[in-house]
Amino acid sequence: MQLGDLLALEPHGPDTWVGTGPSYPWGGLYGGQIVAQGLMAAAHSVPEEFAIHSLHAYFIRRGDASAPIRFEVDRIRDGRSFFTRRVVARQSTGAILNMSASFQLAEAGAEAQTIQMPDAPAPDSLKPDSWSPLFDRRQVPSTPESGRGQAWFRLLNEVGDQSVRHACALAYASDDMPMDAVIAVHPDRVTMKDVWATSLDHAIWFHRPLRAENWHLYDFAVHWLGGGRGLTLGHIFMPDGAH
């Protein structure tokens, strides 16, 4: 199954779409898949000239890979410059995702970027280590207990020319490693067995269009761990340093 297949949602009534997913090694569904499909469902209700600029998702229940996912889109607001959407993903057990997404009409304006791309080995010098057949992922060696990590990633198959489809690809990939970083800084990580962890929420800000088949550097760090939860913040850079 390719990413384009995951994004090929079937219409089931007004602003309602149905998708499916593959089986994953850990069972259940992968959070990045649900977010990517939710974003695609939201985009179906928005004119193509409006681009996604942010999304905020909450994972409510564990997804079932053997059952279809129903994405219900609520048109919160259609403005001149911004469109706001809410997406609820449901299965037979109830809602598994609640997501807000905001789309903006492209406009000219000043641009500044203060964050600099960190140093990292070139992707060609690193070994592929992706669990997904959809992406080529190459992690930069690091000290796990530091709570910091880097990885290059790129989409392996064509996803089309629509900007939102490339944003969906980034959304899919972005949920991949933050949880591993949280587990790595846990003081009992050496003695813990049968650890089960899942994303509780996920937010992405999109600053510019991207091409998912190109290399991107994911630089992330754990900022807090406690109470059975952890917080990881990450930045994604294009090879030229654009954020």
Regions found by a protein language model. Give the residues of each.
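Terminal targeting signals and extreme-terminal segments of soluble enzymes
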Residues: 1-243
